[in-house]
């Protein structure tokens, strides 16, 4: 069986479950908060006797992360939001879609609602602001996404379905996508090294000053 490789970039606001989703798929749900500094996760998915290797680029959701560095040769974008965060949902259309279409307008998008377990969580008394499945479908049409899926990393529900969908959609777009001039000019190689090193040093300093051992994330 011939192996195909799909590059997927995972986008979304901070603390909405991007890293937890990928870690859950790989080893199970993480009990501690994992801050993101560019990380890659690889998965093998078998669809119709064909093995596809999906490389997921986990990006930070803050302004300080030079995300476009990870965009060249991308076959698929995942735009995530938390169903408990109306702001992260709205940002899919107002922030993340413009960024994606600015650099790689022809790459397919999968819209993903995370933390669906919170719909049945007693800790949330007022769920009137939660994003419904129907609203997710409407947003899919607004941003012209190829699919809308929901998942819970905590319950490991919908995660496998998401990756199967990624393999199917990504497989249909394995042609090499040449980044436009905006992307080529965004950062040169020296800037990449300086920015990445500054980010890592900043994270290590913050990690030494802040004890996050008791901080958990529900996904």
UniProtKB/Swiss-Prot annotation:
State the organism named in the record.
Dictyostelium discoideum
Motif Effector region covers: 33-41
Family indicated by similarity:
Belongs to the small GTPase superfamily. Rho family.
Q: Which GO terms describe its biological process?
A: actin filament organization; cortical cytoskeleton organization; establishment or maintenance of cell polarity; mitotic cytokinesis; regulation of actin cytoskeleton organization; regulation of cell shape; signal transduction; small GTPase-mediated signal transduction
In Swiss-Prot or TrEMBL terms, this protein is called: Rho-related protein racN
UniProt-annotated binding residues for GTP: 12-19, 58-62, 114-117
User: Any idea which UniProt keywords this protein has?
Assistant: Cell membrane, GTP-binding, Lipoprotein, Membrane, Methylation, Nucleotide-binding, Prenylation
Note the Gene3D superfamilies from the entry: P-loop containing nucleotide triphosphate hydrolases
């Amino acid at each position: 069986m011939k192996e195909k490789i799909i590059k997927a970039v995972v986008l979304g606001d901070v603390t909405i479950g991007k890293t937890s989703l990928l870690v859950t798929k790989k080893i199970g749900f993480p009990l501690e908060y994992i801050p993101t500094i560019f990380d890659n996760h690889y998965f093998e998915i078998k669809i119709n006797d064909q093995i596809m290797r999906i490389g997921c680029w986990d990006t930070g959701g803050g302004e300080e992360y030079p995300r476009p560095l990870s965009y060249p040769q991308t076959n698929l974008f995942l735009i995530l939001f938390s169903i408990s965060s109306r702001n992260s949902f709205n940002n899919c259309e107002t922030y993340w879609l413009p960024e994606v279409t600015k650099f790689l307008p022809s790459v397919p998008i999968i819209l993903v609602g995370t933390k669906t377990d919170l719909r049945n969580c007693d800790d949330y008394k007022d769920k009137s602001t939660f994003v419904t499945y129907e609203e997710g479908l409407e947003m899919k049409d607004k941003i012209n996404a190829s699919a809308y899926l929901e998942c819970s990393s905590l319950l490991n529900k919908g995660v496998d379905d998401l990756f199967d969908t990624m393999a199917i959609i990504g497989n249909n777009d394995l042609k090499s996508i040449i980044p436009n001039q905006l992307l080529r000019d965004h950062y040169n190689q020296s800037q990449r090294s300086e920015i990445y090193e500054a980010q890592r040093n900043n994270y290590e300093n913050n990690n030494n000053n802040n004890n996050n051992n008791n901080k958990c994330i529900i996904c």
